[in-house]
């Protein structure tokens, strides 16, 4: 049936609702089936969908899958019960990232620290705490001010005790704090920025994912001004390869995404691919000596002020965020596996559990 202008928003709304109910499950044993995956996750609620991704030719498991619950509350309950172990193997559940969000800086990086832009002069720490504590336990809140004038510079950081609240906040695009629209992004350390930029230029390896690397200070909002360029696919041509049901892929391309570090896909958003040309620095500098790369000299005084409207973090030298990358069909392309690394698969590499 031909799609009409009326059905497109409805489909998008349905997809967004599904996105909040879907988990990516990485690190699956080759022995794990859809039945055993379903049996495990049904302890937290009713599943509306469950799939183990397989190679279309060999039918061998690629070491990851997806489960979709009937409600967000069930997803929260499952994530609160981590760690998860299926068929004798500890797996890595993460909130699935839709295709349109997958290419954003930090989309697949696991951190505990959140960058918050759009903070106005009348917004205080307690406003941030009141808003964000519903997502999880907060460790620290910092609103950045000018050292000389003491005025707020329009941004700050919220650090949680776990990465899942940050992932959940990142998925929910629109946030209003103290009556003002706010822009939220995962806060990346200089090392993480460099890893992301290295992957974009085709020099990256298979970094895996795991521990949050989010403690302490010294963070920026992620590479790429306007939060547009910069694939987070830790590794040239790697990432998720295929995908699932029309949702964005990991950095290796395809549809539904979870996290980097799963070895080689075929095509898609591979590191350094076209369409991610932004090399500009959003705020002009880093934060507490973590600037690095395109973020300037590295002192947070070079970070600039957040005076623009949300979604306009600074000048771009080039851009073109998004664009299709060999999306293929719902179950097409890519090779994944729970062991090894490199072009034909794998989970592992340097996973940071």
Swiss-Prot record:
Region: Disordered, residue numbers: 193-353
Job description of the protein: Heterogeneous nuclear ribonucleoprotein (hnRNP) that associates with nascent pre-mRNAs, packaging them into hnRNP particles. The hnRNP particle arrangement on nascent hnRNA is non-random and sequence-dependent and serves to condense and stabilize the transcripts and minimize tangling and knotting. Packaging plays a role in various processes such as transcription, pre-mRNA processing, RNA nuclear export, subcellular location, mRNA translation and stability of mature mRNAs. Forms hnRNP particles with at least 20 other different hnRNP and heterogeneous nuclear RNA in the nucleus.
Modified residues annotated as Dimethylated arginine in this record: 203, 213
Molecular function via GO: DNA polymerase binding; G-rich strand telomeric DNA binding; miRNA binding; molecular condensate scaffold activity; mRNA 3'-UTR binding; mRNA CDS binding; N6-methyladenosine-containing RNA reader activity; pre-mRNA intronic binding
Modification after translation, per record: Asymmetric dimethylation at Arg-266 constitutes the major methylation site. According to a report, methylation affects subcellular location and promotes nuclear localization. According to another report, methylation at Arg-266 does not influence nucleocytoplasmic shuttling. Sumoylated in exosomes, promoting miRNAs-binding.
Cross-link (Glycyl lysine isopeptide (Lys-Gly) (interchain with G-Cter in SUMO2)): 22, 104, 112, 120, 137, 152, 168, 173, 186
Name recorded for this polypeptide: Heterogeneous nuclear ribonucleoproteins A2/B1
Biased composition (Gly residues): 202-223, 320-353
Residues with Omega-N-methylarginine modification: 38, 203, 213, 228, 238, 266, 325, 350
Domain notes: The disordered region, when incubated at high concentration, is able to polymerize into labile, amyloid-like fibers and form cross-beta polymerization structures, probably driving the formation of hydrogels. In contrast to irreversible, pathogenic amyloids, the fibers polymerized from LC regions disassemble upon dilution. A number of evidence suggests that formation of cross-beta structures by LC regions mediate the formation of RNA granules, liquid-like droplets, and hydrogels.
PTM annotation (Asymmetric dimethylarginine): residues: 203, 213, 266
N-acetylmethionine sites (modified residues): 1
Organism expressing this protein natively: Rattus norvegicus
Tissues expressing this chain: In the brain, isoform A2 and isoform B1 are abundant in large ganglion-type neurons, such as Purkinje cells, and are less abundant in neighboring glia cells. Isoform A2 is more abundant than isoform B1 in brain. In testis, isoform A2 and isoform B1 are present in spermatogonia and spermatocytes, but not in spermatids or sperm. Isoform A2 is more abundant in the adrenal medulla than in the cortical cells. Isoform B1 is found in both adrenal medulla and cortical cells. Isoform A2 is more abundant than isoform B1 in the adrenal gland.
Post-translational modification N6-acetyllysine, affected residues: 168, 173
InterPro entries according to UniProt: HnRNPA1/A2_C, hnRNPA2B1_RRM1, Nucleotide-bd_a/b_plait_sf, RBD_domain_sf, RRM_dom
Nuclear targeting sequence: region residues: 308-347
GO cellular component, one term: catalytic step 2 spliceosome
Residues annotated as domain RRM: 21-104, 112-191
Residues with PTM Phosphoserine: 29, 85, 149, 189, 201, 212, 225, 231, 236, 259, 324, 341, 344
Record-listed Phosphothreonine modification sites: 4, 140, 159, 176
Residues bearing the modification N6,N6-dimethyllysine: 104
Sequence motif Nuclear localization signal, residues: 9-15
Pfam families: HnRNPA1_LC, RRM_1
Subunit structure: Homodimer; dimerization is required for nucleocytoplasmic translocation. Identified in the spliceosome C complex. Identified in a IGF2BP1-dependent mRNP granule complex containing untranslated mRNAs. Interacts with IGF2BP1. Interacts with C9orf72. Interacts with DGCR8. Interacts with TARDBP. Interacts with CKAP5. Interacts with TBK1. Interacts with STING1. Interacts with SRC. Interacts with PPIA/CYPA. Interacts (via C-terminus) with FAM76B; the interaction results in retention of HNRNPA2B1 in the nucleus and inhibition of the NF-kappa-B-mediated inflammatory pathway.
Residues bearing PTM Phosphotyrosine: 331, 347
């Amino acid at each position: 049936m031909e799609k009409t202008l009326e059905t497109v928003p409805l489909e998008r709304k349905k997809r967004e609702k599904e996105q909040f109910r879907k988990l990516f499950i990485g690190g699956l044993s080759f022995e794990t089936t859809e039945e055993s995956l379903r049996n495990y996750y049904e302890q937290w609620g009713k599943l509306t969908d469950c799939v183990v991704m397989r190679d279309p030719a060999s039918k061998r498991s690629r070491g990851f899958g997806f489960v979709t619950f009937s409600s967000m509350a069930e997803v929260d309950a499952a994530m609160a019960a981590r760690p998860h172990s299926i068929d004798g193997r500890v797996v890595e559940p993460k909130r699935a990232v839709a295709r349109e969000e997958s290419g954003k800086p930090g989309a697949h990086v696991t951190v505990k620290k959140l960058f918050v832009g759009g903070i106005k002069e009348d917004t205080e720490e307690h406003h941030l705490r009141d808003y964000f504590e519903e997502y999880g336990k907060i460790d620290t809140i910092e609103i950045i001010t000018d050292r000389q004038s003491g005025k707020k510079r329009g941004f700050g950081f919220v650090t949680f005790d776990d990465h899942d609240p940050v992932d959940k906040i990142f998925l929910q695009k629109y946030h209003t704090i103290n009556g003002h629209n706010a822009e939220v992004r995962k806060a990346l350390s200089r090392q993480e920025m460099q890893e992301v930029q290295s992957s974009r230029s085709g020099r990256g390896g298979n970094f895996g994912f795991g521990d949050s690397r989010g403690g302490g200070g010294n963070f920026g909002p992620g590479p790429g001004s306007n939060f547009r360029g910069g694939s987070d696919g830790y590794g040239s041509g790697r990432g998720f390869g295929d995908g699932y049901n029309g949702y964005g892929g990991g950095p290796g391309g395809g549809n539904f995404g979870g996290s980097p570090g799963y070895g080689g896909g075929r095509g898609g958003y591979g590191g350094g691919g076209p369409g991610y040309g932004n090399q500009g620095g959003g705020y002009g500098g880093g934060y507490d000596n973590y600037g690095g790369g395109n973020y300037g000299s590295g002192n947070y005084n070079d970070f600039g002020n957040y005076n623009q409207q949300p979604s306009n973090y600074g000048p771009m030298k080039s851009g073109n965020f998004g664009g299709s990358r060999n999306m293929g069909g719902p179950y097409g392309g890519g090779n994944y596996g729970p062991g090894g690394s490199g072009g034909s698969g794998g989970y592992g590499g340097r996973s940071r559990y």
